[in-house]
Amino acid sequence: MTEAGFHLKHHLTSFQIMILGFAGVILLGALVLMLPIATASHTWTPFHEALFTSTSAVCVTGLVVQDTGSYWSGFGQTVILLLIQIGGLGVITAAVMFLMLSGKNISLKERSAMQDAISAPVVGGIVRLTRFILKGTFFVELVGALALLPAFCRDYGLRGVWMAIFHSVSAFCNAGFDILGRAGALYPSLTAYISDPLVNIVIMLLIIVGGIGFLTWDDVCTHRLHLRRYRMQSKVILSATAILIALSALLFFLTDFAELPAGQRVLASLFQAVTPRTAGYNTADLTKMSDTSQAVTILLMMTGGAPGSTAGGMKVTTLAVLAANAVAAFRRREDPQLFKRRLEPSAVRNAAAILLLYLGLTFAGAAVISAAEGLPLGACLYETASAAGTVGLTLGLTPQLGTLSQSILILLMFFGRVGGLTLIYAAFSGHDLTYARYPKEMITVG
């Protein structure tokens, strides 16, 4: 190793390594997707379109500028699936996996990076947890693919095997990519399966399992039904996930899908409640949903899943911390609480910072796109919320946007996957963060 390489390796923080890792994989994926072998027509793909697709795959978003099923060849779809898998696991986790397979020891620096990548509380036991994550991921994806086989093989014959594998991995990684499109029926997502209980239920379960986080899996597998032994964070994630799904499903049932039979209406409402929190699949025509439902969908997209999961967004824990802080303010309590545990002041500060970052970037991006494209702000906000939340739901605008607007979505997808605080910590690493403690003074708010 050169002196410069040694210096770089040992002076980069785990946050900087994470960001450079994601950026490197995205760039490599874009270069491969440009090749004629990656497209069904065997033509070169413009760099910007390849970069958008690679970013969407690695950031497990699902927004596309070309229909995945009809534009990309089998090789191109395989590359996209590999990028989705790396993005879902996380670049650091994938790198640690290759180190394990090669028999190399995992250094303390690599363990620390892994800790940050999956939001683990301590470095100890990180290798065991990584093995658990890898085994759990491939097991769940295999079971999901086997469960989807009957439906896809019924409709597509032997090609259904590949489709079952692709959609199982994409759903578990909360990516939302589909390969069901064909000439004359582009960007279909799962609309053909709105009345298929098997496909709906399997996809929903894969999305939920992928979106609750690896540490939550560890609690569930270790303590099973002994809920009191769960980490407070796992309790918050499971409770918030259940509440968000139940409330949004009820709202969608009351405001949409009136044309469907009762059973299908319940199924469609549930699916639409699960998928906005970073999965990106849809069984219904999103453009026909009510304004209320579209507004709620935007909020769900920004909320996202759990920390240390395949999901993006602000995270349900951020929402829970802000809600607990609001309750403490209403009750004039000094400390916000969740499940009989006081929250650290740093958690409240971080939650407020994340909220401001997501709101600011999402609305700013929507405003720029609206001005550049001459489109309604609300429709643009739907696309930017989908990008920042790494969701992939769209009202059909993304493929029609210009290069500037699509570049904004690329940046938002990257921001949504690596996380706002990760970007800030990486940017300010190495700076002297000591500060003077000034006198306190009250300020009136509200």
Regions found by a protein language model. Name each.
Residues 1-446:
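Membrane-proximal intracellular helices of multi-pass ion channels
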